[in-house]
Amino acid sequence: MAERANDIRPGQVLEHNGGLFLVVGIMHTQPGKGGAYIQAEMKNIKTGAKHYERFRSDATIRRAILDEEEYVYLFTEGNIVNLMHPSNYEQITINLDLLGEKKIYLQDNMKIKVVAYQDKIISAHVPDYVTLAVKETESVIKGQTATASYKPAILENGMRVNVPQFIKEEDKIVVYTPDDSYYERVKE
């Protein structure tokens, strides 16, 4: 879809120089001399490389039309992830690498967002918030809770997260997946 460069927003995907680029950030600049332009920080979807591009405000850009579908995680076999569409039960497979480092969060029946461009899957995403049990953590030492402090914990999937002092082993916590941080304790 053709648009003016002035309408570029972070989070959009552009077709540019024969590739797909995710707009990470933009800056509108109006120099004292010459026309206004947009400096866009973009990330190549295929390679992950960052790229900076300058567009004139009145230039025409092409925004990619993406299809997003939610699938349910079934199982992983080797480097292949098997997913099922929740309404028509169609099963698809994707490469585990599409999830990147977030593959550690995969759980049975988890909803996975799959993004396709021209019927080719280009990315997959786990939910922003995932509930996990604390497998191992240090016990609280009395008097150590006067200030807000964190302690390391190992979760059921093997990852390490810093959690507040009141978290005990077997507690369930919510992890914010974009930055792999503690979000809250699950109230039972």
UniProtKB/Swiss-Prot annotation:
* Stretch forming the signal peptide: none
| One Gene Ontology molecular-function label | translation elongation factor activity
Pathway membership, UniProt = Protein biosynthesis; polypeptide chain elongation
* Keyword terms, alphabetized: Cytoplasm, Elongation factor, Protein biosynthesis
Q: Does the keyword Electron transport apply?
A: no
Quote the subcellular location field of this record: Cytoplasm
Which Pfam families is this protein grouped with? EFP, EFP_N, Elong-fact-P_C
Presence of the UniProt keyword Cytoplasm in the record? yes
What is the superkingdom listed in this entry's lineage? Bacteria
Which SUPFAM superfamilies would you find in this protein's record? Nucleic acid-binding proteins (SSF50249), Translation proteins SH3-like domain (SSF50104)
Question: What's a single GO CC term here?
Answer: cytoplasm
What Gene Ontology terms for biological process does this UniProt record contain?
A: peptide biosynthetic process
Report the protein's function.
Involved in peptide bond synthesis. Stimulates efficient translation and peptide-bond synthesis on native or reconstituted 70S ribosomes in vitro. Probably functions indirectly by altering the affinity of the ribosome for aminoacyl-tRNA, thus increasing their reactivity as acceptors for peptidyl transferase.
UniProt xrefs under PANTHER family? ELONGATION FACTOR P, TRANSLATION ELONGATION FACTOR KOW-LIKE DOMAIN-CONTAINING PROTEIN
The family assignment reads: Belongs to the elongation factor P family.
Q: What is this protein called?
A: Elongation factor P
Species source reads Wolbachia sp. subsp. Drosophila simulans (strain wRi)
Instruction: Provide the organism lineage as a comma list.
Output: Bacteria, Pseudomonadati, Pseudomonadota, Alphaproteobacteria, Rickettsiales
